Structures are given as C-alpha cells and as structure tokens.
Amino acid sequence: VLFHYLKYTSPVWYFNLKPTLDHAYFPTLAQLELDGVALEPDPAFTSEEARQRDLAYRAFQLGYINRSAMGAQPSAVWQTPKLPTEDEYRFLWKNFSKVWVVYVLIIRLISLKNPVAEIAGFLKSKNATRKLYHRNPIKYPDYPAFESKLVAAQPFVTVVIPTLNRYVYLKDVFRDLEKQTYKNFEVIVVDQTDPFDKSAYDGWQLDVKFWYQKDKALWRARNEAIQAAKGEYILLYDDDSLVEPDWIEQHLKTLDFFKADLSSGVSISTVGAKVPEHYSYFRWSDQLDTGNVLLKKEIFEKIGLFDTKFEKQRMGDGEYGLRAYLAGYRNISNPLAKRIHLKVGEGGLRQMGSWDGWRPKKFFGPRPVPSILYLFRKYHGNTAARWMLLKSLPPSIIPYQFKGNKILMVVGSFLSLLLAPVVLWQVWLSWKRSGEMMN
C-alpha cells in the first residue's frame, strides 16, 4: 500500500493490491512531467519517500490516466518501507475527514503502539489542509473533439439486461435504447418475472432477444447472456435505469481515447448515499457496476465469467472488477456515460435480499451478507477484512435510505454498541458462511 495507515481507512481498496500489469496508476514526478501534468511534491512531509507517495496518490485522485500504452513507467509504491509517523498522519489529514484521522489514532493507541510517537505525529501534522480533488481535477481538453476510430468502425455491441418483476421500468429502458445515437447493437434480456409476459417485448424498434429463466439467479442470467452474445463488446445494464441518447457512443469513445479495456459509467442513485464527488471527471475506476459498464467480450474469455457463489448475495460485480484489475486490464471511470439508477423498491435483487450487503433483511441474519466477506478474505486476507468490518459495521445499523445522513451515521455507531451481542452474532454467522464459500 502507499501508506501503512491506509489499511485502517481503506483496507479493501483495489489499488492496495499489485496488478499483473501496472499502467502507472501511481506515477512518479518524471512520469507526470513527461505527460505535461504540473504537480509538485508537498515539502511538508519529512521524508522524500512520503513526498513521492503523496504525489502519486494526488495524481491518481485528480484523474491522472497514462494514455500511452508504451510510455507508462511501473509504479514504485507496491512495497511500503517504514515511513515517519508524522508523515503517515499528514497523509490522513490531507485525504480523510477529522473523524477518520482520530479513528486511526484511537486504533493505534488501543493496539499498544508507541503513544508518544502516535500523539506527536497526530499533532504535528494536523495543520495539513484537506485536499478536495474534485474542485480542480486533471482535464482532457482534447476529448470533446476526439474523432474515435472505434466508434467509426461500428463494432457490434450486446446490451445485457437481467430483469425480475419490473416490466413498467423495462419500458423506459427500451425507450432510452431506441433513442441511442449509436445503432449497431443488440439487446439480450433474461427475464425471471412471474408471470412471464412475452408481449412486453413486442413493438420495439430494437434487435431484442429474450428468454424466460425460471430460477431467480442474477449471475447465472448474466453469464448465459454473455455466452449467447454476438457482440464484440458487452454492455451490462440494469432494468431500473435511465440513460442519455449518447450513452453507448460515450462508452466506446472513452475506451478508444484512453486505450482502455473497460468503461465504467457512473451511476447516480436516487436513494441512499450522496453521489461521490469524483463521479464528475475521468479517473481510474476502483469499482465495477454491472448496471453500467462496457467491456471487451474477450475479457470474459480470458479471466472467466461472473462467480456464481455471489448468487442472491452482493458484490459479484465488485469481485469481477477486482479480478479484471489484477489481470492488468485498464478500467476508466466515465462521467459522460452516466445512468440514473432509480433503485425502485420492488423487483430485482431487492426482492431476494436487502437494500445493500451490510443491512440484513432478518434481524438475526448475517451482517454483512457472507459474499462480501468472501470477497474481502479471498483477495485482501482476513486482517483487511476485519479492519473493514470495524469501519463499516457501526453505520450499517442505520437504514439504507438514511445512508447519506451524517448525524444518523454517528447515532448508528452508538447503537452498534448497545446492540453488540446481536451484531457480534451476525458477524460470526457471516464469517462462518464466507469461510464455507472459500472452501
């Protein structure tokens, strides 16, 4: 990891792990100068190593993307030497809220680390200014006028949509697809609705293929649709979403412009947490959302299909995104291929589980759903999974629709203490079942 203390604040971040192929995710000063990006090391850090690592992290968060397939210099950050405690805290002050910096200090003190060094490092660095990267991201001014050869070549695209009891919303999906400026695509719908209504697919000016799947199995549906797809590119989509007419075109253009393998369109949810600020500009993507991502079909042929162990659970798309990243594929967060995610209350995965993976539907059900711990433990290890539990459990006590309310998130932390016996049971159950999934 870039800084050791990131293991407390971001224990399961994709970029804590070294990929097979490094695309200069964390560039050196020389790499930035080569690409004409004006960033300077922060002299407030006491060590040169910390200055270079902070510079690399800032470049990442500002949206630095190396566009030269041959020009990228591998990052030198995958092995982390011991850094001065003051520099560790300075990095936290610059990138996280005061709550999280205090959280790390408490964890370090409880862990019996040197209290003098920890408190001194905390206090000496607290004058650091919090960085708000979204206010001045790296821009790509040549993107609007970029004439994409990929778009001009008109590759065939397959849009994959699993659906379950959402015919009303599926109509809006089809209307948006009819309006697309890019026309060379097919649509495959795997319908799990009861009762199945074949007439829902009549009358649309689209190349629609569909079939009924009796089993309510989301990942099986996507896998079978991908196997049946004729497209050179697969565009994964949800049945409760809205997009602009240039949606497909922007996905393809972004792949071409950044020489990428995946274009992860941002998803603007109408329910839950606020929209992340980095959704407004291009950057390396640290997630994969199967409700809005375009990728080369050959990726599925090389690293496999979705892991069906996530069936009726959560984060199967997160696992695939991490798998693609580790295999060396370039994944771009694309603000110009956004979708509005309605997150309607009926149908879909909501019908089979809770609003998200950290809030069980049953009071004594596992928290989080076992597939989340399966993902964390499989790729990041048990220690990182435990740090993520410690960070994420308290706010999960509050219902999903209040996820963006900071005051209620604090209330959730206190409630988690009152409900500790129940929460510990839920976590034990999830840990046990995730272990069974790993065997």
PLM regions: where:
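Non-catalytic, C-terminal membrane-associated alpha-helical segments of glycosyltransferases
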Residues: P84-S148, K378-N439
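Acidic donor-binding loop at a coil-to-helix junction in glycosyltransferase catalytic cores
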Residues: T46-D54, K312-L322, N334
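Conserved donor NDP-sugar-binding/catalytic core segment of glycosyltransferases
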Residues: V1, W13, L242-Y279
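N-proximal low-complexity "stem/linker" segments adjacent to membrane-targeting elements
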Residues: P11-Y14, Y64, P74-S75, R108-D176
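Active-site donor/metal-binding and catalytic loop motifs
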Residues: D54-Y57, L62-D87, N334-R359
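Glycine-rich, basic loop-to-helix element that forms the pyrophosphate-binding segment
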Residues: Q213-A229
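Short, acidic, metal-binding catalytic loop of nucleotide-sugar glycosyltransferases
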Residues: R175-N184
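Short aromatic/hydrophobic "clamp" motif used to bind/position activated sugar donors
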Residues: I234
